[in-house]
């Protein structure tokens, strides 16, 4: 499948996977790509498969010459589902923002090598954190 940008989806998937463990291939469809990060474990006592994490997820949508994104912070629960949550703990919030900022920078650099840009989606309502240094 070739996306509107003219790049084959298989090549984009391979390049996105090179960014690290963020890409969730099973949740990518057509011109939509899903990434997430389980940044902070809520409680290390439960068995690994029962742990919950604070983190973020970002969805990209391919367009002609750019990708648009929207992201959210929240809780990845025991069932493997994301729930948007306001992060109250300053240390956790800082960690989430730092990991998202780092991912965003590397994603933008990767897209630039393909002459594509990365911009917030028009319907993205969240207050943007400063993503570029």
Curated annotation (Swiss-Prot):
Per UniProt, subcellular location reads as: Cytoplasm
Gene3D superfamilies linked: Sigma factor-binding protein Crl monomer (3.30.310.230)
Q: Name one GO biological process term.
A: positive regulation of DNA-templated transcription
One Pfam family cited in the UniProt record for this chain: Crl
Region annotated Essential for activity sits at 99-122
User: Which GO cellular component terms, listed alphabetically, does the Swiss-Prot or TrEMBL entry include?
Assistant: cytoplasm
Q: What is this protein called?
A: Sigma factor-binding protein Crl
What's its job? Answer: Binds to the sigma-S subunit of RNA polymerase, activating expression of sigma-S-regulated genes. Stimulates RNA polymerase holoenzyme formation and may bind to several other sigma factors, such as sigma-70 and sigma-32.
Q: Which organism is it from?
A: Serratia proteamaculans (strain 568)
Q: Which gene encodes it?
A: crl
Q: Primary place of residence?
A: cytoplasm
Query: Per its UniProt entry, which superkingdom is the organism in?
Result: Bacteria
Family, according to the entry, reads as follows: Belongs to the Crl family.
UniProt keywords, alphabetically: Activator, Cytoplasm, Transcription, Transcription regulation
